[in-house]
Amino acid sequence: MIALIIGILTSLIITLVGTPLLIRIVHKLNYGQYIRQDGPKSHQVKRGTPTLGGVVIVLAVVLGWCASALYRFCTTGARPTWAAILALFAMVSMGVLGFIDDFAKVRKKQNEGLTVGGKFFGQVVFATIFAVLALIVPTRSGFPVAQAGMSFIEKPFLSFEFAGRIVAIILFVIWVNFLMAAWTNAVNLSDGLDGLCAGSSMIAFVGYAIIAMWQMYHLKGQAHSGFTYAVSDPLDLGIIACCAAVACLGFLWYNCNPASIFMGDTGSLALGGLFAALSIITHTEFLAMIIGGLFVVETLSDVIQVGYFKATHKRVFKMAPIHHHFELCGWSESKVVVRFWIVELMFVITGLIIFYGNWVGLSGLWHH
């Protein structure tokens, strides 16, 4: 518990203190956000707002976990786990891609950064490294960091081992690449209104913190009753999820409307990468679609809009992603954001109810 508190406080302090420092640095460098011309006209006043705020979020999560890990090492001798290292690798690597994209935008003074091909190549490289290591690295718990299959909760409903180990690794790499691309882009799409991405991500990571901590207390070989999970080092994952949640909370202090700084692709891609990693390592890849339901809705609205327009030359929404649709319907930006937070909270509560119900069912407690 003390290790968790240390991690949370470290992450929160870093974002609360580091964000205003970054705002001043970005102001001096004149690295402001460039707003898309085809967006809502009301957003043009945001032109020049400092960006690259995701740098602080990433540092806060990494250093928060490091502080927690250092305390545990000094008090219990516990060493860093591969589960934590790979989760942070997913976050940092996607954050680096986002930083390169953001930096290119502010240097070129336009809203176009990395090419689609360049971003895709980077995602493939980092996701593949994550996937391969997650299957092959040894762990003290005896459970692999990830399992070669697709899972809703814990047990894979589709195992990739049906055709041998090599084929399983190849299929898992493809699956992880899809998840990383999907979640990084989904979270990125939600970063269109002040505070929307930070607040929604905070709620989603609280959901994963609860899931990871529950798995820790019901870990196979340690729990005395009920269904147990064969998950690698869920305590570390819970601490990282908590650090991510409070990092988003601290950043939200400066990112709420009117925003003093934007997280940029540095933040949104990093948060998406971490969310994907947590879903993979906790064996909840499909449950994640409910836990991160708001991001799924944002993505679907964009896909539907583009697909329908190409087919009929008409639009389903006034503008996509869907948060812009409600803006153009007359909702204030703050109203859209708060209501979307509420929607995300309902998704997380629903996901946790399903997660707990699954545990109760597998534990055979429905019959008592």
Swiss-Prot record:
Its EC number is 2.7.8.13. Its cofactor is Mg(2+). Belongs to the glycosyltransferase 4 family. MraY subfamily. One of its GO terms (biological process) is cell division. The gene is mraY. Pathway: Cell wall biogenesis; peptidoglycan biosynthesis. It comes from Bifidobacterium animalis subsp. lactis (strain AD011). It catalyses: UDP-N-acetyl-alpha-D-muramoyl-L-alanyl-gamma-D-glutamyl-meso-2,6-diaminopimeloyl-D-alanyl-D-alanine + di-trans,octa-cis-undecaprenyl phosphate = di-trans,octa-cis-undecaprenyl diphospho-N-acetyl-alpha-D-muramoyl-L-alanyl-D-glutamyl-meso-2,6-diaminopimeloyl-D-alanyl-D-alanine + UMP. Keywords: Cell cycle, Cell division, Cell membrane, Cell shape, Cell wall biogenesis/degradation, Magnesium, Membrane, Metal-binding, Peptidoglycan synthesis, Transferase, Transmembrane, Transmembrane helix. This is Phospho-N-acetylmuramoyl-pentapeptide-transferase. Its main location: membrane.
